[in-house]
Regions:
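A residue-level marker of the well-folded mature domains of exported/periplasmic proteins
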Residues: 1-106
Length: 106
């Protein structure tokens, strides 16, 4: 998160108006850089942690896309059972979706 914060701070200094963090570390780094800059920069992230949820609650990150681990686990087990029983497991990739979390959905 520290390196991501430095990178995000550099972008903010150059006038960037929006930053996307592609994982927890870069999302936290982006939120912390926005907080320290005291400027209006839109931060959007990917992943879910208590730190990210607090950054959203405090207005430093607009939203984050969170994976659905329960769906991932369910679909994984379903595919494993089918494979063990010799059945066709279907698609090579299974879209388990994401949930968008913002202040309104906290």
């Amino acid at each position: 998160a520290a390196k991501s914060k430095d990178i995000a701070a550099n972008y903010i200094t150059q006038g960037c108006v929006g930053i996307f963090g592609a994982n927890e570390g870069s999302t936290v780094g982006t939120g912390n850089a926005i907080q320290e800059a005291g400027q209006t920069v839109i931060g959007v992230g990917f992943d879910k942690s208590d730190t990210i949820l607090n950054l959203i609650k405090n207005g430093y990150i607009l939203c984050t896309m969170a994976q659905n681990p329960d769906v991932m686990g369910y679909e994984g087990i379903q595919s494993a059972v089918k494979a063990l029983e010799g059945e066709d497991v279907g698609e090579e990739f299974i879209d388990t979706g994401v949930s968008v979390i913002n202040k309104d959905t906290l």
